[in-house]
Regions:
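Short N-terminal targeting/anchoring amphipathic segment
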Residues: 197-203, 207-227
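Membrane-proximal helix-turn-helix segments that form the acceptor-binding/catalytic region
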Residues: 207-215, 248-274
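Conserved donor-binding/catalytic core segment of Leloir-type glycosyltransferases
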Residues: 311-330, 339
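A conserved nucleotide-sugar
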Residues: 332, 336-344
Length: 344
């Protein structure tokens, strides 16, 4: 199995996630076993994967431990009826929203947010004490089950997180503490097969997950070395890892390798190979690392013989279209400066 490893799949994807999805589909077309695996908790990973028609080939580390990889919604809970009929609560619907205030007699106890106007898809429920202080939040998976609850302390600081299976069993607990004004993870407890595993950091949990996941010569294809390079560096050498560099490897300041690729070049022997996008980069890196490991050039996707749907001779003059995410490293400011110079 090829595990295409990333951090998170969200509603709006970057070029890295787009490359992962394209690779997954290409592998599937050629009968190569593969899955996209993400390490961050995201209760809507299944929903977003479904938008790309890959929902059966995507899961997260949390899906793995929560026993929810193949989970499909089986029934729809009527929350409004449950609160009104079974719990005898009083509901007040918040105007111009999908939100509901919930009262136990006269006391305000819960605030629920739904993703739809029909109040079918529950997103979260906040719980309040008798002083109207928020003390707990429950977050629901897009498939309908309670995925995570957060116990809140002073100033709504997270004290404890519980992660659940679709059957309601707690499988992961995370404890937090205020360290120098920053809410910091101090302990992770994993309940697995009637045993408990203890971790001090999220990276330790991810490392344990990858050791459990990869069996029988399974291979990892790493697309996020900056975020996961330290995890991979401590991974058992028996697990082959291919790393993909989605950008140039040299710093623009002339200080050598870019900081977010240093974990790769500082741990070269940990990797089976490096994949880059151009032949020139392939040659440069091979020379730089003195051919210690293979460097492979796989060009990025492109469209040949594109048929224009418009008459290019009739296009409007003095207009430029720029397609990029609105982030600093896309050099949007440089593009704006170019336009300013053209029009002044």
């Amino acid at each position: 199995m090829n595990y295409i490893l990333g951090t998170i799949l969200e509603s709006k994807i970057t070029g890295v996630e787009k490359a992962q999805i394209n690779r997954l589909k290409l592998f599937k077309q050629h009968g190569i076993s593969s899955k996209c695996v993400y390490v961050k908790w995201n209760p809507y990973s299944y929903t977003y994967a479904k938008q790309h028609q890959i929902e059966n080939d995507v899961f997260t580390m949390y899906d793995y431990f929560q026993k929810a990889i193949n989970y499909k919604k089986t029934k729809q809970v009527n929350w409004i009826q449950y609160w009104e009929k079974s719990c005898r609560y009083t509901l007040k619907f918040v105007e111009n929203s999908n939100d509901v205030r919930i009262y136990d007699e006269e006391q305000f106890v819960m605030y629920a947010h739904f993703l739809d106007k029909q109040y079918h898809q529950l997103n979260y429920v906040n719980y309040f004490d008798h002083k109207r202080r928020k003390v707990k939040r429950e977050l629901y998976d897009g498939r309908g089950f309670l995925s995570c609850s957060r116990i809140l302390g002073e100033g709504q600081r997270i004290v404890l997180e519980n992660y659940y299976t679709p059957n309601g069993e707690i499988v992961i607990q995370k404890y937090f503490d205020d360290i120098k004004g920053k809410n910091t993870l101090t302990k992770v407890i994993l309940n697995e097969d009637q045993q408990q595993q203890f971790f001090d950091t999220e990276d330790e949990l991810v490392q344990y997950f990858l050791h459990q996941l990869c069996k029988n010569n399974d291979q990892i294809i790493l697309d996020r070395p900056h975020e996961l390079g330290n995890v991979i560096a401590g991974l058992n050498q028996s697990i082959p890892v291919v790393v993909v560099l989605h950008s140039t490897h040299l710093s623009g300041t002339g200080n050598g390798i870019k900081s977010f690729y240093k974990t790769v070049f500082n741990n070269l022997t940990r990797y089976k190979a490096i994949v880059v996008s151009t032949e020139q980069q392939c040659q440069d890196i091979s020379q730089y690392i003195e051919n210690k490991i293979p460097v492979i050039n796989i060009p990025v996707g492109y469209v040949a013989n594109l048929k224009y749907q418009f008459d290019i001779n009739q296009k409007e003059k003095n207009h430029i279209i720029s397609i990029a995410r609105l982030v600093e490293n896309k050099q949007i400011k440089h593009q704006i400066e170019v336009i300013k110079q053209l029009v002044t």
